Amino acid sequence: AHMRVEEDSAVGRADAVVYMPDAVFVFELKYDGSAEEAIRQIDEKGYLIPYSADGKRLFKIGVNYDSTQRTISDWIIRED
C-alpha cells in the first residue's frame, strides 16, 4: 500500500490518494467547509475516474477541519 498527496486528475487535484491491493481511497480535505462539499468536489472533478478501470473498490472520503475547534468536525466515507 502507498499514498500520494496532491494527485493530479484531468480537471483537478485530489488532496490524497491511498492505494491498497484491492481498493483506492480518494481524500478531499476542506478547511472550515463541509464534508459534503468535499464529496461533491470529488464527484464534480472526476477524481475517481483514473482508477475506475482497475477493478478495485473505490472510496471517496470527504473531511472538514474546523479552525475554531481545531479538530476534524465532519467526515463522510462513500463507496462508489
PLM region spans:
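Conserved helix-loop functional segments at active or binding sites
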Residues: 1, 47-51
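Active-site metal-binding core of divalent-cation-utilizing nuclease and nuclease-like domains
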Residues: 1-21
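Extended hydrophobic-aromatic, low-complexity segments
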Residues: 2-7, 24-28, 36-38, 54
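Short, glycine-/Ser/Thr-/acidic-enriched flexible segments
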Residues: 10, 23-24, 31-32, 67-68
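Structural beta-strand/beta-sheet cores of well-ordered domains, especially the beta-sheet scaffolds
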Residues: 12-14, 25, 56, 61
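Conserved catalytic cores of phosphodiester-cleaving nucleases, focusing on short active-site segments
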Residues: 16-31, 45
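Mg2+/Mn2+-dependent nuclease catalytic core
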Residues: 31-48
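Domain-level recognition of nuclease-like catalytic cores that cleave nucleotide substrates
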Residues: 50, 54-80
